């Protein structure tokens, strides 16, 4: 059976660079196949990903093996400058559309409280 949703980190992003990210909604898998009411959104962004789907496929596969269901809410890009303590969220995913960057930014701010975290809908 799946563990508590609270054990899944809200944010996991690479420490430096510009890279793609996705916003994913995670919920417990119900035996009936219907999504559970309890859910949370998580942010995942990595330099190794050529496509947004690469991130979603890897993360959702891991979560599904642990008893969760996932849906991708959209994507974009993250510019992470750890030396300057700045993170900027922007752009969109050709495959998944634009993530709600305001939601992603709030999650990132909680993990990086001493950073300047901004977002914009411009760019690709």
Swiss-Prot record:
Keyword check for Cytoplasm: yes
Q: Where's it mainly located?
A: cytoplasm
Q: InterPro entries, alphabetically? A: Janus (IPR007702), Janus_sf (IPR038596)
Disulphide bonds annotated for this chain are none
Q: Might you give the EC number(s) for this enzyme? A: 3.9.1.3
Q: Which residues form the signal peptide?
A: none
Question: Would you name any one GO CC term?
Answer: nuclear body
What is any one GO biological process for this UniProt entry? Answer: positive regulation of cell motility
Q: Which reaction does it catalyse?
A: N(pros)-phospho-L-histidyl-[protein] + H2O = L-histidyl-[protein] + phosphate; N(tele)-phospho-L-histidyl-[protein] + H2O = L-histidyl-[protein] + phosphate
What domain of life does the UniProt record list for this protein's source? Eukaryota
Q: What does this protein do?
A: Exhibits phosphohistidine phosphatase activity.
Q: Which family does it belong to?
A: Belongs to the janus family.
Per its record, how is this protein called by name?
Answer: 14 kDa phosphohistidine phosphatase
- Give the species: Mus musculus (Mouse)
């Amino acid at each position: 059976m799946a563990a508590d949703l609270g054990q899944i980190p809200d944010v996991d992003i690479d420490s430096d660079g510009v890279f793609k990210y996705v916003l994913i909604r995670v919920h417990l898998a119900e035996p009936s196949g219907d999504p559970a009411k309890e859910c949370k959104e998580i942010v995942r962004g990595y330099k190794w990903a050529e496509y947004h789907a690469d991130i979603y496929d890897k993360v959702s596969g891991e979560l599904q093996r642990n008893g969760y269901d996932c849906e991708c809410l959209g994507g974009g890009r993250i510019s992470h400058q750890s030396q300057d303590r700045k993170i900027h969220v922007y752009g969109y995913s050709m495959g998944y559309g634009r993530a709600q960057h305001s939601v992603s930014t709030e999650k990132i701010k909680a993990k990086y409280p001493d950073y300047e975290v901004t977002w914009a809908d411009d760019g690709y």
